[in-house]
Every structure is written in C-alpha cells, then in structure tokens.
Amino acid sequence: MDNPFVKTVDTIAETISNEIKVNQEEVFRFLMEPVKEEYADFSFPIKRFLNNPESIVLKIYDSLKSKNLKIVNIELISGFLNIKFDEVKLFEKITDYIKNGGGIKTKKSEKQLSIVVEHTSANPIHPLHMGHARNTCIGDTLSRLLNARGHKVNRRFYIDDMGRQVVIAALGFKTINENPMELSKKINVKPDKLVGWVYAVSSTTLDALNAKKKNNIEEAEKLATVLTRLKSQDPDNLFDNLFSGLNALNDPEKEISNIMINYEKGLEPEKSLIRSMTMSVLNGFIETLNRLDINFDNWDWESDIVWNGLVDRVINLAKNNKYFTKFKDADALDIPSIINDLVKEDQKISKIINLPKGFELPPLILRRSDGSTLYTTRDIAYSIYKFNETNADKVINVIGADQRLPQLQIRLALLGLGFKKEALNLIHYDYEIVRLPGKAMHGRRGEYVTLDEVLEDIKNKAIEELKNRNPNINNDVANEIAEKIAVGTLRFSMIQLNAMKPLTFDINKALNLRENSGPYLQYTYVRALNILEKHGKINYDAIKNETVNHKLRRSMLIKTLKFPLI
C-alpha cells in the first residue's frame, strides 16, 4: 500500500506536468518550495509557464477529480496554483495506511543514478580543523541524502600528496631524520598533530629565511614571533634540531624542487618519505572522522594518478587537440577558444557551464617548462578517472567557493578535450568559509582549531550540563551521552545554514537548547520517543479524525507527511 499523501503529491505533479508540458521533476521542485500555511500546503507558480492559466486550472481540477483525489482543494490565486489538503479526509486515509503496516519512508527517485561524491580531501599536512568541518559534514550529509533517495553513492577522498605544502612537511622530517608514525607513537602525539607542527615550523622558518634574504626586517620579526610560539608547543624537544637543520640548507628552494620532481617520478627515497608521512596523517584523519561517523569507499592518491600514466595521457590528448597552445613557455589549453567554440554557440551547454558574465579566463597551463604538472592537470585526469572507475552518471565535488575558478577551468578543459559527458555532469558543490569568533586560521603558521579540540570542548560542556541537571548520573553514561551531543552539535551546526553564507561557529550558541541547534533536535526526538513510549500502543480506531482540525495538529500532520518528500 502506497503512502496516500506522497501518492497524491506525485499525481498532482504528474497532472500539472502533462497539462502545461513541463518536466515533472521541475514541477515537483516548485511544489516543494516553502509556502505560508494559511494559503496552501503546496503552491505552483503556473503564471511562469502560461499567459492565461485560468483555462488550464479547470482541466487540472477535472483531471484530479477523475483520479478520485477528493482529499485536495485547488485554487488559482494571483497566478499561483494553491493546493490544500482536506485534513480530516487525509488523516482518515493516513490512519488506514498506518493500520495496514505503512510507515514514513523517503521517496525514491524515479531515475536512480550512480553518483560519486568527493569531499573533505584535506591536505595531509595537519589535523582536520574547523576549516574542513563544513566540507566534511556537507559531503557526508549529501551522500546520505542521495543514498536515501535510492541512488548508488560512491564516497571518495582525494589525497593531495603532490603539492608544495606536503613537500615542505616532508623536508622537515628529512631534516630531523625521523619517521612521523614511529615518532608519534614514541612521544604519544596524534600523528596528524605532529605533522602539522613540523609543517608549521618548516614553512615559517623557510619564509623567515626568505624575508631576511630580501632584507624585509619587519616580516622577519613577525615570523620570529611565530617561531617563538611554535617552539613553546614543541612536542619532544624537536624545534632546535629542525630549525638549525633548515637554516643549514644551502638552497632550500632547490631542495624543495628536487623532492617534488623526484616524487612525481616515483623515485626513492622521496617516495617512501612522503608516502609514510602522508599515511600517518591519514591515520589521524580517520580517527577524527570515525568520531563523526563519516566513512569513505575509496581513498585516491594524487600520486597514483600520475604514476599510472593518467596525467601523461591527458597531456598527450591535449597535444593532439586543436585547443593545444603554448602559454608563458608552457604546455597549455586555449580556454578562451573552447568558450567561444563550444560554450557560447550551444545554449544547453552554456546554461550548464554557467559562465559568469564578463568573466575572462586565460589559457590553462598543463605542464611547466621544467616538466612538472600542475594540480589542475592532475584534477582533469582525476575527474576522468572518477567517471570511468564507477561508471558514474554524476560526480559531485564538495569544494570551497574559493575554488570556483579552478573547478570551472577543469570543466572547460574536459569539454575541449572531448569529454562532453564528464564536463556537463561534473558538479561543483561550493560553500563559504567557517569563522570562529576571535580565532584566525593559518595552517602555514600552525594557527587553527582542530575538529578534535572542538569536539572535546563541546563534549566537556555537555558533561557539565548533564551533571548540573542530574548530579547522580554515572560518569560512563554521561560520557557516552556527551559524545553523541558533541557529534550532533557539530554536524547540525555545519549544515543548518545555506552553504553559500559564511558561517560563524559559536559553541555556546550551538549548544543552546533554546536555539535551533543540534542538541535541541536531539532533545525533541528523545522527548517525542518518551511520550510515545509512555502512551503505549495506539488504538487508531478510537481516534476522532475531526480533532486534526486544530491549527497546530494540522500543521504537525502536514509537516510530518512532507518529510519523505524533502
């Protein structure tokens, strides 16, 4: 037996679609837009699609009537088709549905797709911090929602192990001649935290050397202050050895360049050095992600994309492509020509790519004159890999709004190289930054608030509140409840706001039971369960359907029934 509410909404969407010749999914999206309860339960802006909607409304009404849909009323008001349920008749049908074993289940998509969601993909140079929190929570929530809709979802983490930042961290460990995993065990420090400290000291020391070389005294003094702070955070008397070792390098830039080029070629000892360091950071990531109940199906190494020859194939494809060019003495793709030839001339492609008006893009460099590749080149290869590996219909990249330009360049490059399907089905799910009141985040200087620290802060505050409310609570029970509150608080805070709005995270506000917060949601859920438990088995035959006429009861009924459609 089908859910009568969901079935009715589907029938309404199908009827409107047939009458006005608009895709049913588009009709459904409009129906799901928020509407004021006093006007309707659902509303459709029919005036957007028809100049004279009055004649169609009667047809829609007759069509719904012929399908025996007597539980809805339809009105045309100011160009909107307002749909309101007869709550008594609806409630009667819903109680029959429940008595026959029906329940509230998420509506499955008519067309179930294979979808890749790549998210988090943090640089393996320090712990996951609040700058990553929104990405990881949005990515995991999106994956769960798509899965609930019946899509086959593949969750992937891209390990960016070929960037300059990773090389700087690796140079730090090379300088002190330590293996990060072994050292972290020996000194009992979480491996990602250890690598983050070594990276910050190495990066700041090298920048200070560069400032002195340029005789920039003011900058050198600022960096000296940063180094003093980092020295005070030394986990095991490592600072002096690391600082002096980096200062002793004849040419740090040449050292960095050599490590980077050799690692891209897969040569030893650079391969073992960077792989072992990166693995130690990933172990730290996994420990944090496990607390948040976030898992991945695949961990993809950027270096594997290079070593497997996928990047070379992309460059060879480009060289034999009419859009290949030279830009700043480097191999490149002529992005402006791709836009003129393939985007501006095709209305459908233009709508999907959605180029900002007046936005001009330069050619995209694929390989530097020294033979090394850029991360955008590797991202092009990785995008093709994600589609091919999973036979994906869609690939969603959850990446910050600051990466709009590179993400746009990748799609245009794919289009120019002949990967039209991939270009049009690669989706950039962007989001704005997370701020912490009074806190600056700067990974190169070791300035960040880690997810571990935030979870512990929330957990400790939750334990304090639990003990205030119930002084006799068992410590283990309090700890278990507080952990769930901490995870719920963080996850809810990261996804409740529109992704395109900057988010300021305030722990006290996030924990406030009087606010729209994770703990409030958890409390409401537990309270509702307790009420149902105390009530016992519900005798649906004894319910008077007319009682649903009450404004609040009606509102609760409609909102609850809308849940599977969201």
Residue ranges and their predicted role:
Residues M1-V22:
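Generic start-of-chain signal for non-secretory N-termini
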Residues Q24-F49, P53-I566:
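NTP-dependent nucleotidyl-transfer catalytic core
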